[in-house]
Amino acid sequence: MKEQAIDSALILRKSFEHGEALSEIEISELLKESKLVEKLTRDYEDSPFFNIFRLICLSEIPFIEQLPYTQKIIDFISNNLAADEGFSYNGQGDCIVPCYNAMLLEAYTRLQMAKSNEAQNALDWIKRYQVFERNQRTSWRYGEICKHGGCMKATPCYIGIGKTVRALITYAKYIKNADSHVEQLIEQGIVYMLKHNMYQRLSNQ
């Protein structure tokens, strides 16, 4: 059976993770040759959820921010979904919820935009309002956060916590663990996830 060739986006990802230096020409060629990049940049929809999830996919590929298509997605999110206090799934400040805020923070970090106002607002939202324990009340003033399955009811949504911890770990790596508050939140999140066996997704433990 003939082995399938490795997509050039994966080659780019491995080189990036191993710290291998690549020239601008090499990066450009690897992006250009990638079937995955071609598929991800083939279509476009002028809608919040399309742009959110497309950016999340794109952000897994190093240097993808160089493409005009990626910049188009970033511009849509920055102009339409980045509220004053964090990322919102519809652009309204009262519709900031943990999972979407965290996913977009991580995507912006991977796209070398961790220091942007949009990413910093998302990070500040986590620092101020995310809870990592049961029976704690968030000081976030909008009720949307208790809809959609209950992001922060008596038992905070495990998806929101998991994505928030992942985003914080990605951000911490980018800034070389220079933010002690971020490190503290990561520790709190991991302790909570292990304590409640969240990695097993069991509701009876």
How should each PLM-predicted stretch be described?
Residues 1-205:
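Preference for long, amphipathic alpha-helical scaffolds in soluble/luminal domains
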